[in-house]
Amino acid sequence: MGVKRSLQSGGILLSLVANVLMVLSTATNYWTRQQEGHSGLWQECNHGICSSIPCQTTLAVTVACMVLAVGVGVVGMVMGLRIRCDEGESLRGQTTSAFLFLGGLLLLTALIGYTVKNAWKNNVFFSWSYFSGWLALPFSILAGFCFLLADMIMQSTDAISGFPVCL
């Protein structure tokens, strides 16, 4: 297995981990915890009783960015799988990288918005759902770099293939 294929495989694995962490973060209700209970993007639980959170603009932006980040991340991973499996395919790694970087940017926007909204509250602590979102960010960015580097290797190989010199 060459360097290009190793980078592509690594990018797929990293994007899979990022997507699992993003889905876990988005779906669970442990973004913050208080003395009385915990809350997430969808529900707030106090003393064991959970209810829907009333619509707030900042929270709506966070939810939208998280859902879009998951969707864009899954599309990027599927594109990466197609590149890895279809050797003759002319799909470029730059597009896959762009999708993975966009997913990371949307994730970063969601997490910063949620942090700004809740950082100044007393007796509110961020919990594991929130931190799994932050943990997904470097995986998404690293996956994008893997596909970008693999594409650069492919471009350089194509560029020097016409030269009679054996490197």
Curated annotation (Swiss-Prot):
Gene3D superfamilies: 1.20.140.150
Localization per record: Membrane
Top-level division of the source organism's lineage: Eukaryota
GO cellular component: plasma membrane
Pfam (any one): PMP22_Claudin
This protein's UniProt keywords: Membrane, Transmembrane, Transmembrane helix
Membrane topology label: Multi-pass membrane protein
Record carries keyword Membrane: yes
Transmembrane segments: 7-27, 59-79, 96-116, 134-154
Positions of disulphide bridges: none
Membrane recorded as keyword: yes
Family of this protein: Belongs to the PMP-22/EMP/MP20 family.
Protein's recorded name: Claudin domain-containing protein 2
